[in-house]
């Protein structure tokens, strides 16, 4: 893929040259259709964002984003009519993936038939997905060929309102427990109101074991401040507290991919952060958009670049966690 870079950073959109301004100058060829279609209508202070803008974003961010997706089955959220029209979630691409694109076939939960998920292993694949009007990519917590064993643990902090101070405090509490166990904690905005805390795993445990491990950590965090935190799945029972959700730690479940755009006004991005950025005045989990993130990457790089060099085997940590909870 031909992307102009300065200092190792993606700088210049790929498609803004040629007859109609959008020519797919890459091998394999990716045909770009309807680049002027508005996917994000103008709203308040947000200007309209086109399909071409979305494609350009994913092309620019691809060198950073692809390593986080490589080997993971994906689910795509598509909005052919834009975000003000109903979109749909697609997992099975058995009949529509181009020949050159990677894929993984997994058995359906029912045991009847299979699902063919796209797998992003190259920059062109992100451009192809964006051209399918895919705004948001969600990825599994495991990679092939070891789909039964997660390589990351995830805590999804889901607030009841816009009080970010409570979300931030909860995120730091999760990180404190994770780090006390000897693991490394990473943080990402969701592009909405919450945060994801992620800890890389060594792939020695199945999903049930990992989820129970995460559930125990979440229990410690909630017990430390039950007034503001909860494990209650039902929204009606949360009483305005932050839900510390560990249910994504399951086979076939997904989390919003790092650097994915969300289908919300202004095109906010699910953005990996440095921990000190949580304390920046005015910080909002939806505060970074597809307009801002490529420039930010040139200035700060990828906070998750070393994540999988910090992976920990889970087995030795289970006794340590039991002692923390004693």
Model feature map: region roles:
Residues 77-79, 185-191, 232-236:
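Short beta-strand
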Residues 175-189:
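Active-site palm subdomain of RNA-directed nucleic acid polymerases
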């Amino acid at each position: 893929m031909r992307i102009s870079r300065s200092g190792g950073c993606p700088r210049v959109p790929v498609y803004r040259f040629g007859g109609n301004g959008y020519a797919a100058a890459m091998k394999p060829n990716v045909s770009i259709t309807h680049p002027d279609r508005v996917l994000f209508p103008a709203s308040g202070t947000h200007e309209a964002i086109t399909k071409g803008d979305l494609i350009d974003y994913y092309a620019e961010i691809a060198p950073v984003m692809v390593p986080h997706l490589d080997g993971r089955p994906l689910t795509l959220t598509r909005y052919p009519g834009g975000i003000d029209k109903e979109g749909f979630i697609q997992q099975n691409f058995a009949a529509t993936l181009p020949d050159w694109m990677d894929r993984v076939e997994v058995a359906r939960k029912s045991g009847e038939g299979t699902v063919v998920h796209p797998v992003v292993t190259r920059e062109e694949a992100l451009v192809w997905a964006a051209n399918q009007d895919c705004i948001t990519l969600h990825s599994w917590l495991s990679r092939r060929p070891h789909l039964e064993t997660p390589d990351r643990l995830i805590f999804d902090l889901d607030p009841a309102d816009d009080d970010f101070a409570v979300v931030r405090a909860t995120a730091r509490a999760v990180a404190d427990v994770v780090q006390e166990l000897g693991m490394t904690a990473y943080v990402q905005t969701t592009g909405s109101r919450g945060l994801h805390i992620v800890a890389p795993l060594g792939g020695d445990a199945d999903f049930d074991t990992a989820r129970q491990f995460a559930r125990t950590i979440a229990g410690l965090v909630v017990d430390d401040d039950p007034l503001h935190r909860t494990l209650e799945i039902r929204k009606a029972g949360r009483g305005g507290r932050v839900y510390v959700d560990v249910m994504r730690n399951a086979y076939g479940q997904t989390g919003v991919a790092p650097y994915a755009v969300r289908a919300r006004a202004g095109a906010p991005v699910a953005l990996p952060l440095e921990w000190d950025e949580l304390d920046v005045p005015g910080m909002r989990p939806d505060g970074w958009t597809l307009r801002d993130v490529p420039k930010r990457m040139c200035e700060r790089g990828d906070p998750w670049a070393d994540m999988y060099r910090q992976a920990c085997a889970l087995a030795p940590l289970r006794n340590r966690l039991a002692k923390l909870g004693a």
